[in-house]
Amino acid sequence: MALKVIKISRVSPATASVDPLIVPLSFFDLQWLKLNPTEQVFFYKLTESSSSRDVFYSSILPKLERSLSLILTHFRLFTGHLKWDSQDPKPHLVVLSGDTLSLTVAETDADFSRISGRGLRPELELRPLIPELPIYSDSGAVVSLQVTLFPKQGFCIGTTAHHVVLDGKTAEKFNKAWAHTCKHGTIPKILPTVLDRSVVNVPAGLEQKMLELLPYLTEDDKENGRTLKLPPVKEINAKDNVLRITIEISPENIEKLKERAKKESTRAELHLSTFVVTFAHVWTCMVKARSGDPNRPVRFMYAADFRNRLEPPVPVTYFGTCVLAMDFYKYKAKEFMGEDGFVNTVEILSDSVKRLASQGVESTWKVYEEGTKTMKWGTQLLVVNGSNQIGMYETDFGWGRPIHTETMSIYKNDEFSMSKRRDGIGGVEIGISLKKLEMDTFLSLFYKWIGN
């Protein structure tokens, strides 16, 4: 897809502050220090006349820039940098007077309907819609944005964000707040404004243990954990033929999966939530689609929200990351490749979700620590990005809700995405990105149990 960069703007908060802002990373922030940035894109379809170049540059873009400046007053951290100076024991988020957020403005002549669709599309065609986020060994930006015009068709907003500054809930609040401000010209009343990391109460010593784990998360630099440099990502080139697809799973199909779990399990009182059965179905289809050695190690994870699980609970207005990985690593592929693979996964996830009510941060951390330290080369990994509680379609900037959203970072981070459906009638929406051969097998297996 041909892309022309029109300009790169530096957007500053509407209300300037001369005081520096320095926020040390919390235990939860540190866990995501070595994860490659989260990338999302929101597609907005417009009429031919409202998406002309004249209208876009005279009306739409100025409104987006003006509202972004207003909302950055309350999301000032997004204009700052991640820093790790040699004298500091851990990294900090630092915002200085005059710091700004990078906003790239671009155009493309690509077919908007196809690019923003839900069907199979080449991964490479969508990559240009995501802005770069420069990260070096001792410093890095935390958020960058890109607005791309499809003349006479629509536009999209691409975001790239470092996970240390936000999780799914914080990202959702920012997107909604920016959209609300653009549409109505007013700032929402409730915003995540608490930056004080002391409200995150975790057992003493966990932060240091997390820092000691960092070298294990950077495969090319085991001896040096003191770097912000990210591990290498999976390269995507044309010959790999990596495809992505968005699948909407209806409430009826969710019920099919729940009934299947009840029928195949000998255990009573399973926690059969939409999240559990969807994750179990995707995971088992992924393992089978990979085929290969049945004795290969596998590892799957989801992020649990600990805001209400700490004592005392974290304020609802907390600005930052407050999720911890629930890790499942003591398994081989063969345990999920057979007909009982689905129910095996359901039981594992069900037990995990039920334990969350009583399981503390420290015991959850110990499992993740062991899984990370013992992870072997060639392990098949899958992480769910998001959940069926995260809604990405309530972001109306004044030109209607997005017709589609994509989490673009799922391929390189060994993830699949999960969120609420756009139509709001229940069920769930998932995003998958795989090489064509695996994708063909995955879809065949996926639809076998729930229908098209």
From Swiss-Prot:
* Superkingdom in the source lineage: Eukaryota
The EC number(s) given in the record are 2.3.1.64
Ordered alphabetically, the record's keywords are: Acyltransferase, Transferase
**Where does the signal peptide begin and end?**
none
Residues the record marks as active site: H163 (proton acceptor), D396 (proton acceptor)
Q: Which reaction does it catalyse?
A: 4-coumaroyl-CoA + agmatine = N-(4-guanidinobutyl)-4-hydroxycinnamamide + CoA + H(+)
Which InterPro entries does this UniProt record tie to the protein? Answer: CAT-like_dom_sf, Plant_metabolite_acyltrans
Q: Which GO terms describe its molecular function?
A: agmatine N4-coumaroyltransferase activity
Effect of inactivating the gene: Increased susceptibility to A.brassicicola infection.
Top-level enzyme category: transferase
> Per the record's keyword annotation, is Ion transport included, yes or no?
no
This chain's function reads: Involved in the biosynthesis of hydroxycinnamic acid amides, which play a role in defense against pathogens. Agmatine is the preferred acyl acceptor, lower activity is observed towards putrescine. The preferred acyl donor is p-coumaroyl-CoA, lower activity is seen towards feruloyl-CoA.
Which family does the record assign? Answer: Belongs to the plant acyltransferase family.
Protein known as: Agmatine coumaroyltransferase
Tell me the organism: Arabidopsis thaliana
